Amino acid sequence: MENDLSFGEDVMSYEEESDSAFPSPIRPTPPGHSGNYDLEQSRQEEDSNQAIQSIVVHTDPEAYLNLNTNANTRGDAQAYVELNELMGNSWQETGRWVGYEENFNPGTGKWGPSHVSYLTFKSLIQLRKIMSTGAIILDLQASSLSAVAEKVVDELRTKGEIRAADRDGLLRALLQRRSQSEGAVAQPLGGDIEMQTFSVTKQRDTTDSVEASIVLSGVMDSLEKPAVAFVRLGDSVVIEGALEAPVPVRFVFVLVGPSQGGVDYHESGRAMAALMADWVFSLEAYLAPTNKELTNAIADFMDCGIVIPPTEIQDEGMLQPIIDFQKKMLKDRLRPSDTRIIFGGGAKADEADEEPREDPLARTGIPFGGMIKDMKRRYRHYISDFTDALDPQVLAAVIFIYFAALSPAITFGGLLADKTEHMMGVSELMISTCVQGIIFAFIAAQPTLVIGFSGPLLVFEEAFFAFCKSQEIEYIVGRIWVGLWLVIIVVVIVAVEGSFLVKFISRFTQEIFSILISLIFIYETFSKLGKIFKAHPLVLNYEHLNDSLDNPFHPVVKEHIEYHEDGNKTVHEVIHERAYPNTALLSMCLMFGCFFIAYFLRQFKNGHFLPGPIRRMIGDFGVPIAIFFMIAVDITIEDAYTQKLVVPKGLMVSNPNARGWFINPLGEKKPFPAWMMGACCVPALLVFILIFLESQITTLIVSKPERKMVKGSGFHLDLLILVTMGGIASLFGVPWLSAATVRSVTHANALTVMSKGPKPEIEKVLEQRISGMLVAAMVGVSILLEPILKMIPMTALFGIFLYMGITSLSGIQMWDRMLLLIVPRKYYPADAYAQRVTTMKMHLFTLIQMVCLGALWMVKMSAFSLALPFVLILTIPLRMAITGTLFTDKEMKCLDASDGKVKFEEEPGEDMYESPLP
């Protein structure tokens, strides 16, 4: 398909033809066209044309938003464009482009900030008009600007665009000296928004392969009419003195003419420069075999342009529909019809024949087939897993992830000790994290995962401890038999390749569980604070209590007598903890203070104060900073008592009077019931469900194709390693671990290498094992910080739990839809679940999830809390049941579709402690 555009004096006529000798490689599908292209015809046409190198085109639907695709991509090349305008006796550089535009301000002598090019419709019409009559020279063999200039003036003279007497004057003008504008780039107000601090020159100089376009535009009153020439060099060459940097030149565009010619030379020059900076137009210009295809490329560019009527824009928010409309137009623009274009999403041309990406969850039909595939896929890269760690970015990731892993270890350790009466605590959790983390990083198929303790496991430990206590069974011994059954279950699941079941866990189930854990965190925080107020009550006047016999500030000993059948009796003495004045108020201040500091630093991270790297660093370490401040406050207030984190000295267990480092499977203080050894398979199945959910979903998130990891994942092998280590860990009385979603995603993000630009694109991930090993080892060594850890107030950790519970709600679609229940329809977001589904259906879906959430909460608060994972699994068949009955497939795709886009750059209100599964 070709576009034949002819221009009269004041009107543009647009006419499409269907006899194209060279189909545009990227062209919008015309109305009524089915989109079926004759690939065989394209191959025949390709054979008849001159050989053209293979082209690589990004096919990511969001690629047009990124710099690397906004700029020209030919293999590894990017397009760099300079606009030079004739001013007196020299050419002055006034603009430059690498996808985005920078303009030189002669008044200040500085370059302005980068911005999206904006063009007048008149300049495009003028450009199209003069291009239809100008000189177009394709595949010129020249290595100097003088050779190009001579060819241009001769071609213009031959076509009658200039008079013979004008030839020498035009040649002298084209060869005038060039004045490069070397002023500093001006920083815009609010200066560290990524779009504004993007630098064209930095992007140009840091890119390995660049090709340049020179645009020369200016007024020459000696000419009779405007003259235009477009030159495509056969080979890109460095032309000395032509550009401000030694970049190979591929295209040269010349536009000169009289001031009375009816052409705005500045705007027309900017329009041509913007065209050359557009990767689709530049690609078509590179492939065009004749003049007509080049003019058609301009028509294609205009087809995708948007004209804003000359009305006042009172609010920037009014431009949002334009942005959404432009995204749709740009997606429609990517219509490949030329087999010379190799679609690889940024891959090299020689990678076009690579095998399609293997599905790691595909079943082989043989026992342990999935695990064997995981091992073959990953272990062939084992040596590179260590050599790839020789990168400074890995060291930076280790330091960052260490604090990201240490804070939850301390927080969960303190809460675990409180829930289990110190049968397990900080020391056990830190040692477990250290040993299991090192082993996992050393042999796992996906060492990018960070393993650790999590909220769901804490809920299970609390429920299992309460069950054992009610049955007068030794909790720490029962965990051994649960661990043994865990190993048996995981071997069976891995043997039958059961990891494929993760495909059935949709957003419907994930978000219900996510909000449940968040609510548990919030509830437990205020529950603990309430217990402190009860143990240390507030009294209006303390003085009269000094002489009272019922002084609440002294320990109270109460006796409980138990009579036996043989006539003997046992006297139990219960010592109630002494109540302290001001403890409750100080505890509340420490809890909310820790929460608000962490929350403020989270907001500060996405604010405008301080340079971006410093601000983000402070925000990333917000939780440790908040804990440190609360320690300082607690130390300065000496007269008030607060409960501190209990940490044993050295490698001692948390409760040395009740247990040691090795647990006797047959019982520590009394024989373990034989029936319970077999019955432990039930809690083992439940805790396996939790580990399976967290680990497999985390692996699914980290291993998404959009992250461009190349060494494979380990759904089967990693699950076997995790659960087997947990089973062995039970013998030593240390916690089970699972893949921690937040820490794993943060680890992957820290190891990700991004392209430069206002909307960076993932280039690769430094997949290696060293960072995971070092982080785990450093967490283990941190147990030596016992003197410092003992200074942490427990209520400060409650504040962190409140922080984790509240921030984890951010970004959960179910929570957003719950808020929409009280939001007017006109304020609904532009997301598919709110715009493509009726309001009643959307609210019905939300209410179903809320009913499931309520049922799970009732189970959690009842004596059957151990059954929580089983009840959670029941939401999977429920989701299948409502599909096709209450909701159509299209509605479910909008309401329950998984988000395939990787969120690397954190949005406002989002940080490393947020997670779908806290």
Curated annotation (Swiss-Prot):
InterPro entries: Anion_exchange, Anion_exchange_1, Anion_exchange_CS, Band3_cytoplasmic_dom, HCO3_transpt-like_TM_dom, HCO3_transpt_euk, PTrfase/Anion_transptr. Gene3D superfamilies: Helical hairpin bin (1.10.287.570), Mannitol-specific EII, Chain A (3.40.930.10). Disulfide bonds: none annotated. The chain crosses the membrane at residues 393-416, 425-445, 449-465, 475-495, 508-530, 584-604, 616-636, 677-697, 714-732, 733-750, 770-790, 791-809. It is a multi-pass membrane protein. Residues 417-424, 466-474, 531-583, 637-676 are extracellular. PANTHER family: ANION EXCHANGE PROTEIN, BAND 3 ANION TRANSPORT PROTEIN. This is Band 3 anion exchange protein. It comes from Oncorhynchus mykiss.
